[in-house]
Amino acid sequence: FQAEDGIRDVERSRGLGDVYKRQKLSGVWGNHEGSMLLWILILVLFNFFFSLFSLKRKIFQNLTVSVQSLMIFGFTLFILFLSNPFKLSENNYADGIGLNPILQDPLLAIHPPVLYLGYVGFSLVFSFAIAGLICKEIDKTWASIIKPWVFIAW
């Protein structure tokens, strides 16, 4: 949306030629394809920050990152084959259907990413729980490692 090239199907179908940059940015997650792309981006960021800041029990860290990576891989396959946001437009839309009016409000435009931070944040908690079950070591140390990530997601 920011490049102003006007060739993507998402852009043309929404008719975003004359809206502000803020609204163009919120138009990225204004449809299914963009929402899935945002979901993957947040998954990758949580995976990165977890691997960066989690220093206790390396085996938990490795298993958690592996489970997160499997989720990233699955969502990436889904987005590439079934819901591609980078698909070039085959239609010549004159003006499109426009941006969802709800996303034109500044606070409601940031609502989906903030909501996704919580949803996707709990995927890290899920991955850590799977790692704990695999290692059969769910104890106080496990809980102390996962506690800040639960608070971040919440």
Residue ranges and their predicted role:
Residues 21-35, 97-117:
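Short aromatic-rich membrane-water interface segments that cap or initiate transmembrane helices
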Residues 49-73, 134-154:
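Membrane-interfacial loop-to-helix junctions in multi-pass inner-membrane proteins
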Residues 15, 41-44, 66-69, 73-76, ...:
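Residues within membrane-spanning alpha-helices of integral membrane proteins
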Residues 21-22, 39-54, 125-129:
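Central hydrophobic cores of alpha-helical transmembrane segments in multi-pass inner-membrane proteins
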Residues 1-20:
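Single conserved hydrophobic/aromatic residue that forms the stacking wall/gate
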Residues 8, 12-14, 49-61, 76-91, ...:
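Transmembrane alpha-helix boundary signature
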Residues 30-51, 64-69:
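Hydrophobic alpha-helical transmembrane segments in multi-pass integral membrane proteins
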